[in-house]
Amino acid sequence: MKTPPTAASNTDCKETPLLFEDLGSRKVVVDFSGGSLSSDGGALLLRQVDVNLGLTQTLAQCFTDHRQQTFVDPALPELLAQRIYGLGLGYEDLNDHHDLRLDPLLAAACNKSDPLGEDRFNPAHRGIALSGASTLNRLELSNNRNSRCHKLPHDPAKIEGCLLQMGVRCLPKHAVEVVVDLDAMGHLVHGTQEGRHFNAYYDDYGYLPLYVFVGAIPLWAQLRTADHGAAHGVVPALEKIVAAIRKRCRQARILVRGDSGFGREEIMA
């Protein structure tokens, strides 16, 4: 975990700039008076990809925001962007956002007009531009109850369809043939996570997610428990995937490919 950008350091730092060997006609200088720093410059690239795909804006339409909009800070797309960009940067755990909420570069990537959080309405939140772990946890665990702690219910079926359509629209409309690859990959766990099961094939505890690709394009990623075989739940997934591909590529021949774990009559029928 990196040190929060606002954290003070007891180390005596050099204040004078350091000069390095010139790079052609350019001078290379190290200056320690740069102000707010971040080690996550890749967040800006993630934002550009998000803008091109319209990911967070589209996903935001799968949620219902019951919060009082007059007092809302941050907005729903900003919450989604913070969580998704954090995952893309390698911060999988929500408690990572205890420090990430202080990162001005991540705040700028999440479209915050005040990346330092100096103008926030609540004085207790000033200097903290982004949300903490508890807010993001409520977003992830939101349900269909409009209670004090659950103000952002989501529609799982709508999210599923949204992500599928985003993948399918990358396929060429006039494709002659579309090869759909099925894969089940063991995801081992190292604790007592909810839903973990022992899988004899992997000789360990974990999950058995289902992945569906067309070439390098991901169409489906479904978390499943490991107490079933690779083919479990594939038929309902394929029905949705094939229908979406058929709507996009009307003249294409669709082939479904998988290893022996998917050699089941219900899939081949």
PLM regions and their residue ranges:
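Dynamic "connector" segments at or just before major functional cores
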Residues: 1-229, 235-250
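Acidic/histidine-rich, metal-coordinating catalytic segments
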Residues: 183, 252-262
